[in-house]
């Protein structure tokens, strides 16, 4: 959000976050709205399965200008096909849960979306697992990528963990 605020004011989409499900799109949009509340940064969740009114609201936001779009691939392709999106000034592209999107068969849609984005963008790909499909996708869209691997978390050695069943009214006094 901070980097988007440094961008000149425009009607163009500055950041695109592609996610596999409407639930994740809504969750991320809610977080962005909270983080950017006092900044004037605008965002919209674009996903299928809603009413025609939802599509119309999405179209209005996409054509009149929005800073951050959080979208599912299928619905975004629908808007692209109708000429409602312009990614020529896109600065940031995020693929969240890339492994899940590939499992759901979205690879052709992802490649189609990536193909029309500004090539001078920063691209981030997040995945819980790194199967061959994700590695192949990463090679086609990332330039000089940095990989961050997080190990499974375990309790620190020498620390004993315990759980106690306590009635609600006794929780505070027992803490």
Model-derived regions, located:
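Well-ordered alpha-helical segments embedded in enzymatic catalytic cores
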Residues: 75, 109-112, 170-174
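Conserved beta-strand scaffold positions in the cores of enzyme catalytic domains, especially
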Residues: 43-45, 123, 145-147, 161-165
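Conserved nucleic-acid-binding Ia/Ib motif block in the N-terminal RecA-like helicase ATPase lobe
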Residues: 8-81, 89-92, 135-139, 147-150
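Conserved interdomain hinge at the start of the Helicase C-terminal
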Residues: 158-175
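Conserved phosphate-coordination/catalytic loops
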Residues: 53-56, 104-108, 166-170
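Short internal alpha-helix immediately C-terminal to a glycine-rich phosphate-binding loop
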Residues: 1-8
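Small/polar loops that bind or transfer phosphate-bearing groups
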Residues: 16, 20, 47, 102, ...
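Post-DEXD/H (motif II) to motif III coupling segment of the RecA-like Helicase ATP-binding lobe
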Residues: 28-34, 86-156
């Amino acid at each position: 959000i901070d980097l988007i605020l440094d961008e000149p004011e425009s009607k163009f989409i500055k950041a695109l976050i592609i996610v596999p499900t409407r639930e994740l799109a809504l969750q991320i949009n809610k977080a962005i709205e909270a983080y950017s509340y006092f900044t004037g940064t605008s965002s919209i969740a674009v996903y299928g399965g809603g009413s025609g009114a939802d599509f119309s609201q999405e179209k209005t936001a996409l054509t009149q200008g929005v800073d951050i779009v959080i979208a599912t691939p299928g619905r975004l392709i629908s808007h692209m096909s109708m000429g409602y999106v312009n990614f020529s000034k896109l600065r940031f592209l995020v693929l969240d849960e890339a492994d899940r999107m590939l499992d759901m068969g979205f690879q052709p849609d992802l490649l189609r979306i990536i193909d029309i984005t500004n090539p001078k963008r920063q691209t981030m790909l997040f995945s819980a697992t790194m199967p061959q499909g994700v590695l192949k996708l990463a090679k086609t869209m990332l330039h000089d990528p940095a990989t961050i691997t997080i190990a499974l978390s375990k309790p620190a050695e020498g620390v004993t963990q315990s759980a106690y069943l306590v009635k609600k009214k006794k929780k505070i006094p027992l803490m």
